[in-house]
Amino acid sequence: MAMKIRLARGGSKKRPFYRIVAADSRMPRDGRFIEKLGTYNPLLPKDSEDRVKMDLERVQYWLGEGAKPTDRVARMLEAAEVLPKTERNNPKKAVPGKKAQDRAEEKAAKAAEASEAPADEAPAEEAAAE
């Protein structure tokens, strides 16, 4: 049986509330689960202690049994220092787009030309007469 530790949505429309549950991966998101492991209330402020509550002993038990946490639950477990932090990398986000790269190259070329030209054509400044 493939086990998952995931969020099951509760609450009403526009007022989400989630249970952190251990469930068979084939069951529906809000359907039957094996054990409730905690709660997550996204409406509370991020620094609130009540935002995420988990029974860490039971979470570690289910991880030992082979349950795989979903991405969101894995981040919560990393914050609780149950799982080691995984390095996330998005290198393409830092690279500017093609047009921006072209503009930067043109600007660099103009700056190079401008720095060469004024050295030759710069007129000598005359001393101000008093």
UniProtKB/Swiss-Prot annotation:
One Pfam family recorded for the sequence: Ribosomal_S16
Record's compositionally biased regions (Acidic residues): 118-130
Ranges of biased composition (kind: Basic and acidic residues): 99-110
Region (Disordered): 82-130
Matching InterPro entries: Ribosomal_bS16, Ribosomal_bS16_dom_sf
GO biological process, one term: translation
GO CC field: cytoplasm; small ribosomal subunit
Top-level taxon in the UniProt lineage: Bacteria
GO terms for MF: structural constituent of ribosome
UniProt KW keywords: Ribonucleoprotein, Ribosomal protein
Listed SUPFAM superfamilies: Ribosomal protein S16 (SSF54565)
The UniProt record lists the keyword Lipoprotein: no
UniProt cross-references to PANTHER family, sorted A to Z: 30S RIBOSOMAL PROTEIN S16 (PTHR12919), SMALL RIBOSOMAL SUBUNIT PROTEIN BS16M (PTHR12919:SF20)
Record-linked HAMAP family: Ribosomal_bS16 (MF_00385)
Sequence similarity: Belongs to the bacterial ribosomal protein bS16 family.
Protein name: Small ribosomal subunit protein bS16
Gene source species: Dinoroseobacter shibae (strain DSM 16493 / NCIMB 14021 / DFL 12)
